[in-house]
C-alpha cells in the first residue's frame, strides 16, 4: 500500500489480485513490474473457452462489493445497464447475411449490449453494423477484451474485402464501421487488407459513410498512412483507458503515446478525416487522469471521443472497479465538448461504434442547419 494525497491507495485491477501502485501521481517502477509479472499472461487468453463467458450481472460485478447504509451488500445490476433482447426485421436480415457470407462482426464477438439497437435502426440509412475484418482471432491479449487470441491466427480470407463490400451494398446502410483484430503476424499488420476493403465499399456503395477502427500497426506510420488515404470518412483508434492504467488494461505491445501518434498521423496525411477514439470508464481511473487524457487527445487533434462503462467478458478478465452513473457520463460529455471535441457520445452502454451513423449524421446535419441559418441572417 502507498499514500497519495494523504490517503492510502491500493487499487486492485484484476480478479487475480494485481494491484496498480501509484505514488503521488507516478507509478513506482519496481512495483509496477511486479504487478504486471504476476498478472494474466498472454497465454492465459489463448483460445478462450466460450463456457467462461459471463452473464450480464456477472460481467458488471464489482471488484469490491458496495455496503449500503442499512448494512446490505450491493450486487444488483443498476437499471441503466439493462438492455432489451435484440429483435427486428433489419436485425435478422443482417445476421443471416453475415452467416451466409462467413463474415464476423465485433458486435457479436465482443458481446456488445447495443447490437439489436444498432442493427435494427429505425430505417436502413440510420442502422449501423460493425464488420470485423481479418477473422475472429487476434494476436494480442488485452485484459478487457473477449476476442479470441492466438499467436498464429488462420490466414486471411482473400475474398473478404469483396464479400464485405457486397454485403454493405446489399444492406443499404447509411454508415458502416470496419474494425479488425490485431495481426502482428503479418508483414503489414493487415493494412493493405483493410485499405482494399474500404476502397471496394466506396466503389460499390459510394453513398455509405465508412469508419475504420484500426489497430496501432505497431506504430508503423507508413501503414497508418495507407489506411488513412484509402477513402474512409472516419479514422478511429482507441486509447481504451487513461495512460496510467494502460499497462494493466491493454496488451503490453500497446502504448498510450503510440496510440496518440497513430491518431495524429492519420489526421496529418488526410486532413479531411474525422479522427475518433474511445475510453472505457469503471477501471479505476481518477477524474484527474480522465481530464489529462482528454487534454492529450485534443493536443493530437482528435475530433470525436466516446465514453462507456467497462464490462467484464470472462472470469479471466479484469473486474469492474466502479459503476459510473449516467450523471457522471453526462459530466464528461459536457467537459469534452468544452475542450473542443467535434462530437462526444457518453453513456453507460455506449461503445466505440455505438449507433455511430446516427451520432455522426445527426451532428453533421445540425452543423449544416446552423450554418445555413447564420447565412440567412
Curated annotation (Swiss-Prot):
EC class, as a word, reads: transferase
One Pfam family this sequence matches: Radical_SAM
Cofactor (UniProt): [4Fe-4S] cluster
Name the coiled-coil region(s): none
Residues that coordinate or bind [4Fe-4S] cluster 1: 107, 112, 118, 353
Catalyzed reaction equations:
[[Fe-S] cluster scaffold protein carrying a second [4Fe-4S](2+) cluster] + N(6)-octanoyl-L-lysyl-[protein] + 2 oxidized [2Fe-2S]-[ferredoxin] + 2 S-adenosyl-L-methionine + 4 H(+) = [[Fe-S] cluster scaffold protein] + N(6)-[(R)-dihydrolipoyl]-L-lysyl-[protein] + 4 Fe(3+) + 2 hydrogen sulfide + 2 5'-deoxyadenosine + 2 L-methionine + 2 reduced [2Fe-2S]-[ferredoxin]
Give a Gene Ontology cellular component term annotated to this protein: mitochondrion
GO-annotated molecular function: 4 iron, 4 sulfur cluster binding; lipoate synthase activity; metal ion binding
Pathway(s) of this molecule:
Protein modification; protein lipoylation via endogenous pathway; protein N(6)-(lipoyl)lysine from octanoyl-[acyl-carrier-protein]: step 2/2
> Might you give the EC number(s) for this enzyme?
2.8.1.8
Domain Radical SAM core: residue ranges: 123-342
Q: Classify the source by domain of life.
A: Eukaryota
Q: How is the cofactor bound?
A: Binds 2 [4Fe-4S] clusters per subunit. One cluster is coordinated with 3 cysteines and an exchangeable S-adenosyl-L-methionine.
Q: Which family does it belong to?
A: Belongs to the radical SAM superfamily. Lipoyl synthase family.
What is the recorded name of this protein?
A: Lipoyl synthase, mitochondrial
Per the UniProt entry, what species is this protein from, by scientific name? Answer: Schizosaccharomyces japonicus (strain yFS275 / FY16936)
Amino acid at each position: 500500500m502507498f499514500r497519495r494525497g494523504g490517503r492510502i491507495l491500493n487499487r486492485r485491477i484484476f480478479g487475480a489480485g494485481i494491484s496498480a501502485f501509484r505514488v503521488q501521481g507516478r507509478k513506482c517502477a519496481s512495483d509496477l513490474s511486479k504487478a504486471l509479472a504476476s498478472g494474466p499472461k498472454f497465454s492465459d487468453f489463448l483460445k478462450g473457452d466460450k463456457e467462461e463467458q459471463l452473464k450480464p450481472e456477472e460481467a458488471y460485478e464489482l471488484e469490491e462489493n458496495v455496503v449500503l447504509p442499512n448494512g446490505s451488500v450491493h450486487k444488483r445490476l443498476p437499471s441503466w445497464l439493462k438492455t432489451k433482447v435484440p429483435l427486428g426485421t433489419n436485425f435478422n436480415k443482417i445476421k443471416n447475411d453475415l452467416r451466409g457470407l462467413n463474415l464476423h462482426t465485433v458486435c457479436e464477438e465482443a458481446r456488445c449490449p447495443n447490437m439489436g439497437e444498432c442493427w435494427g435502426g429505425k430505417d436502413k440509412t440510420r442502422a449501423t453494423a460493425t464488420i470485423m475484418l481479418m477473422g475472429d482471432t487476434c494476436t494480442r491479449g488485452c485484459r478487457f477484451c473477449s476476442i479470441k487470441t492466438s499467436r498464429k491466427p488462420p490466414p486471411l480470407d482473400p475474398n473478404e474485402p469483396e464479400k464485405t463490400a457486397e454485403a454493405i451494398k446489399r444492406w443499404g446502410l447509411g454508415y458502416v464501421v470496419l474494425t479488425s483484430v490485431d495481426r502482428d503476424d503479418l508483414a503489414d499488420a493487415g493494412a493493405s487488407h483493410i485499405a482494399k476493403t474500404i476502397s471496394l465499399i466506396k466503389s460499390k456503395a459510394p453513398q455509405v459513410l465508412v469508419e475504420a477502427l484500426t489497430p496501432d500497426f505497431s506504430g508503423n506510420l507508413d501503414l497508418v498512412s495507407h489506411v488513412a488515404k484509402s477513402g474512409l470518412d472516419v479514422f478511429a483508434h482507441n486509447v481504451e483507458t487513461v495512460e496510467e492504467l494502460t499497462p494493466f488494461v491493454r496488451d503490453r505491445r500497446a502504448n498510450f503515446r503510440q496510440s496518440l501518434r497513430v491518431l495524429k498521423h492519420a489526421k496529418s496525411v488526410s486532413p479531411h478525416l474525422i479522427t475518433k477514439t474511445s475510453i472505457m470508464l469503471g477501471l479505476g481511473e481518477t477524474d484527474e487522469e480522465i481530464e489529462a487524457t482528454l487534454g492529450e487527445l485534443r493536443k493530437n487533434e482528435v475530433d470525436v471521443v466516446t465514453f462507456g462503462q467497462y464490462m467484464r467478458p470472462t472470469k479471466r478478465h479484469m473486474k469492474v472497479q466502479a459503476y459510473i452513473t449516467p450523471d457522471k457520463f453526462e459530466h464528461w460529455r459536457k467537459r469534452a465538448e468544452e475542450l473542443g471535441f467535434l462530437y462526444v457520445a457518453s453513456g453507460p452502454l455506449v461503445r466505440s461504434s455505438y449507433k455511430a451513423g446516427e451520432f455522426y449524421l445527426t451532428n453533421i446535419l445540425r452543423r449544416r442547419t446552423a450554418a445555413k441559418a447564420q447565412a440567412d441572417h
